[in-house]
Regions:
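P-loop NTPase catalytic core
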Residues: 1-172
C-alpha cells in the first residue's frame, strides 16, 4: 500500500502509465510491433485531471471528444483545437501543414468571437480575419463530420477550398 498523493492516486501511477505506453510501438528485431489506442474517460470533462494529464504527457498524440460539440449534434465530436499529434508535422507535407494551421487558426478565431456573436456584440466589417472565420466556420465544422473519402490529397484539396475558395480555384 502506497500513500495516496496526487488526487488520491499513488505515486507509482505515473510510472505505471509510462510503462504501459512504452510497451507499444516497434518491438525488437523479429518480434513485431504493437499498435494501441488508449481510452481515458475523465470525470466532468476535466482534462486537467491527473490521469488525463499524465496520459497526454506520455503519448505522441491525443484526440479529445467534446460534450459541447456532441450536444450541437456534430459527430464525431472531436475537439480539433484541443486534440494534438506530435508526429503530424513530420508526417504531413509542407502545404498540408499550412492548411492544417490555417484551419486551426480559423476555428480558434471563431470560437473566440462566438460569445460576442451570441450576445449580438460583434460588428462585421471591423476585422477581416474575424469576418472570414464567421463565414467559413459552418463548412469547416461540417468538414470534420463528412464521410472519409479515403484519399488524403483530395481531402486536403477540399479543405483548402473551404478555407480559401479563390486560391483553391487558381490551383485547379
Amino acid at each position: 500500500g502506497e500513500t495516496p498523493a496526487l488526487n488520491a492516486f499513488p505515486p507509482s501511477t505515473v510510472r505505471a502509465i509510462a510503462e504501459v505506453a512504452e510497451r507499444t510501438g516497434p518491438g525488437a528485431q523479429g518480434q513485431g510491433d504493437i499498435t494501441a489506442i488508449f481510452s481515458v474517460l475523465v470525470a466532468g470533462s476535466d482534462m486537467e485531471e491527473p490521469v488525463a494529464d499524465m496520459v497526454r504527457g506520455v503519448l505522441d498524440g491525443h484526440i479529445i471528444l467534446s460534450r459541447e460539440i456532441s450536444e450541437r449534434g456534430r459527430y464525431p465530436a472531436i475537439d480539433v483545437l484541443r486534440s494534438l499529434s506530435r508526429c503530424l508535422p513530420d508526417a504531413a507535407k509542407p502545404d498540408e501543414n499550412r492548411i492544417i494551421k490555417d484551419y486551426r487558426r480559423t476555428i480558434a478565431l471563431y470560437e473566440e468571437i462566438a460569445p460576442m456573436l451570441r450576445a449580438n456584440l460583434y460588428e462585421r466589417g471591423h476585422d477581416a480575419a474575424g469576418d472570414r472565420s464567421i463565414e467559413r466556420f459552418p463548412q469547416l465544422d461540417n468538414f470534420v463530420s463528412e464521410p472519409n473519402t479515403g484519399h488524403i490529397p483530395q481531402a486536403f484539396q477540399h479543405l483548402q477550398g473551404l478555407l480559401d475558395p479563390v486560391e483553391a480555384a487558381e490551383k485547379t
